[in-house]
Amino acid sequence: MLPAFMSLRHFTTTTMRRAASEFRMPVPWGELRGQVWGPSHGRPVLCLHGWADNSGTFNTLVPLLPNDWRFVAIDFPGHGLSSHRPDGCFYAFPFYVADVRRVVEALQWKRFSIIGHSMGGNVAGMFSALYPEMVESVVLLDTYGFLPTEVTDMFTNMRKGINDQIQYDNMANERKERVYTYEKAKERLKVANPYLSDQSADILLERAVREVDGGFVFTRDFRINLKNIIYINIDQCLHVLSQVKAKVMLLLAKDGLFKTFTLPDGYADRICKSWTDQKATFVEVEGDHHVHLNNPEAVSSVITDFLQPQSPDQTESQSGNQTSRL
């Protein structure tokens, strides 16, 4: 069983101050980092951030959720403070699913819930289909849980992803880290993420940059920007979705991701119909793609209500989990 280590840290939100422990877990290429809130025996909830974000995306939401639950929010590899994947490796989507499997094995969680934002919600969807016996409930924050691709685009994207990766590797010795002032780093982050408030940008930057001589550099691996090389089409997506046994809520922002990012014609309707067939819950809230970070009060109560055990007698000890040593 892999050990993991935690150190105490604090953060401040507009609503309250709450202690978080720093999560550290060894993996073959380095370590996974993240944050932990709540008692080790608490009801387990895994929090998965979106692409190019980090576990800080949950820093304002978790303090509004039950304080006797156990929340573990990880930085995916190549994000936040986690190690980058080894040289020459791709950031292919299934690897993120495997990362989750590593984490819950180390935590000794046999059954748990997931809150996933954007890409993290897609990871949650795939994990829940592959390991339906492990996942009790899933909250999908501004995502449909799956991102199918047109068959005609799959191989074009694969070719581009392979070529870009090889080109990146060939230029590795020529590449230098760009150093920013804090304000310039914040400006760059907000240009890439126009939904973020000033406070939200500062929160993400706690784990998104590190200080060096002369300023700050971004911690994330540039390779996360390269094309994914593994996709599923709509028919595969709907089949995989049908394997999910967890209780699912799609918590969508009125001015969220799908106002600017559109799926191919008819895909969203087909995915939503499949979720409806699975008896998923749909909730729309006022806000943008990062509403859970910018305005957590808009989503905290509905998340708490949804994740509450279905039976008052259902406790963490009945889930089959061992009390985590991590």
Swiss-Prot record:
- The first-level EC class reads hydrolase
User: Might you give the EC number(s) for this enzyme?
Assistant: 3.1.-.-
Where is the catalytic site?
S118
Coiled-coil positions are none
Q: Provide any one GO MF term from the record.
A: hydrolase activity
Q: Which InterPro entries match?
A: AB_hydrolase_1, AB_hydrolase_fold, AB_hydrolase_sf
- Know the name of this protein? Serine hydrolase-like protein
Upper taxonomic lineage: Eukaryota, Metazoa, Chordata, Craniata, Vertebrata
Gene name tied to this protein = serhl
